[in-house]
Amino acid sequence: MLNFIIPFIILIVVVVFIHEYGHYYFAKKYGVGVTDFSIGFGKEIFGWNDKSGTRWKICLIPLGGYVKFFGDRNVFSQSDQEALIKKYNEKEREKLFILKPLYQRSIIVAAGPIANFILAVVIFLFIYMFVGKDFTPAVINE
């Protein structure tokens, strides 16, 4: 049984990390504050803070993950913009996901699935390069 569970968990963790890192990379590129980068859900098992203030954590249930943006209160990143403008000062408002232009928010949201697509292409390329393609040599029957 462990012969299947451990590789499954490793595979899920890698896929989730690549997916969430896609969101994280473009969020940072566009100046969105990231407070949490989590692999898994539930209670935190292990974690650390980087120099930009992001909490990187590994959690108990490794069946997903999330990137939490600065100022987000709910999972849908929906907030009252007027309330956010009043709540945060000018420097903090520059880090808010919800106040970024639509094209930047779209890229950040799409970056996770696109990262997974690129991962799939890379895996197939490696399989094709190292395993090769099957062929049947021509045989002449008498």
Sequence positions of predicted segments:
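A broad, low-specificity signal for short, low-complexity segments enriched in glycine/proline
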Residues: 17-21, 100-105
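General alpha-helical segment detector with a strong preference for membrane-spanning helices
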Residues: 23-24, 116, 120
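Hydrophobic alpha-helical transmembrane segments
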Residues: 5-9, 106-107, 118
